[in-house]
Swiss-Prot record:
Residues 1-20, 344-378 are annotated as: Disordered. GO terms for molecular function: ATP binding; ATP hydrolysis activity; ATP-dependent DNA damage sensor activity; damaged DNA binding; single-stranded DNA binding. Pfam families: RecA (PF00154), RecA_C (PF21096). SMART domains: AAA. It comes from Fusobacterium nucleatum subsp. nucleatum (strain ATCC 25586 / DSM 15643 / BCRC 10681 / CIP 101130 / JCM 8532 / KCTC 2640 / LMG 13131 / VPI 4355). This is Protein RecA. Transmembrane segments: none annotated. ATP binds at G80, A81, E82, S83, S84, G85, K86, T87. Residues 359-378 have a biased composition (Acidic residues). The gene is recA.
Length: 378
């Protein structure tokens, strides 16, 4: 007896446009039904999954993530080079989670948390749960116990590289124990993933990068802890320091760019740039200035900045200082910026100056003269 034919499978390649569109929609619907939402989407589509989120403290990064922050009940990886701003970003997420009324735990495997800096970034250190485990298995067991309590909204583990397996700590320095940390992470994440989703607890892993030895083609760096974290993470963010923020000749912060290298809840590969000021964290005012200039809310002419036809300073640092001491002006800029964002993208066509317009008029006159000469010659 012949096998029953699946009517949803075409006999040959579909060539007409309407047929292709319908077939793609049907296939995407089947994938979503069979495997869950978020596994397939059009890269350029603006729609995202209806997922609750925790803001990151950066307006630009919240936009890049597509849902207004990091998703709840998921695993997040923040990775990058040393002193790139990974922990600072995680501390801002902690502060935002606490503002929402959430309970947060910080598992400090590196034993390097600075409570003074955390407080300066807005973290309520009196309410922050902190653990400094002795080895990797202990750290993940503590995390799992906290998740299963059903009372924790966010757990941050700093860092994956410091989650050293007990066997490695108890062993000799000369012992060759390959893949212990990778196996530890794989086993721990398998156990954690289901509970995180069940209790809507977000877990952020801070990770470091390492150079690949003997690589000629492809990426020259990788993250620690094996491949399990890459697989189980719903969102992965790479943090890079791009430059230094200066006030005169004095460095006062870092220019940072974050690339969303993986995103299961919205289209990935978006980037966000912002400034991290020493001792203060992410500069919200700096982000507002950049966004306002991009939307023509604040007009930049050379080094001068103006708002509503009134000069507000020369140089970005002076504008930042002016907005910080003048909350009413900052509120007006924010209001106009929100209205500009709601209107959609700014027309990128360059506005012609009087000189350019005059030049265009001259060119038109020359063309008319040339046309007249050609007609006479004919």
């Amino acid at each position: 007896m012949a096998a029953k034919k699946d009517k949803s499978v075409p006999d040959s390649k579909i060539t007409d446009k309407e047929g292709k569109e319908k077939a793609v929609k049907d296939a995407m619907a089947a994938i979503t039904k069979g495997f869950g939402s978020g596994l397939i989407m059009k890269l350029g589509e603006k729609s995202s999954m209806n997922v609750e989120s925790i803001p990151t403290g950066s307006i630009n990064l919240d936009i890049a993530l597509g849902i207004g922050g990091v998703p709840k009940g998921r695993i997040i990886e923040i990775y990058g080079a040393e002193s790139s701003g990974k922990t600072t970003l995680a501390l801002h997420v902690i502060a935002e989670a606490q503002k929402q009324g959430g309970t947060v735990a910080f598992i400090d495997a590196e034993h390097a948390l600075d409570p003074v800096y955390a407080k300066a970034l807005g973290v309520d250190i009196d309410e922050l749960l902190i653990s400094q485990p002795d080895y990797g298995e202990q750290a993940l067991e503590i995390a799992d116990t906290l998740v299963r309590s059903g009372a924790i909204d966010l757990i941050v583990i700093d860092s994956v590289a410091a989650l050293v397996p007990k066997a490695e700590i108890d062993g000799e320095m000369s012992d060759q124990q390959m893949g212990l940390q990778a196996r530890l992470m794989s086993k721990g994440l398998r156990k954690l993933t289901g509970n995180l989703n069940k209790y809507k607890t977000t877990m952020i892993f801070i990770n470091q990068i390492r150079e690949k030895i003997g690589v000629t083609y492809g990426p020259t760096t990788t993250t620690t802890g094996g491949k399990a974290l890459k697989f189980y993470s719903s969102v992965r963010m790479e943090v890079k320091k791009m430059g230094t923020v200066k006030q005169g000749d004095d460095p006062i912060g870092s220019e940072v760019i974050v690339k969303v290298t993986k995103n299961k809840v919205a289209p990935p590969f978006k980037e966000a740039a912002f400034e991290i000021l020493y001792g203060k964290g992410i500069s919200k005012v700096g982000e507002i200035i950049d966004a306002a200039v991009a939307k023509d809310v604040i007009v930049k002419a050379g080094s001068w900045f103006s708002f509503r036809d009134q000069s507000i300073g020369q140089g970005k640092e002076k504008v930042r200082a002016e907005l910080e001491i003048n909350p009413e002006l900052l509120a007006q800029v924010e209001k106009d910026l929100k209205e500009a964002i709601a209107k959609g993208p700014v027309d990128k066509k360059k506005k012609k100056s009087k000189k350019e317009a005059s030049s265009d008029d001259t060119d038109d006159e020359n063309l008319e003269i040339d046309d007249a000469i050609d007609e006479n010659n004919d």
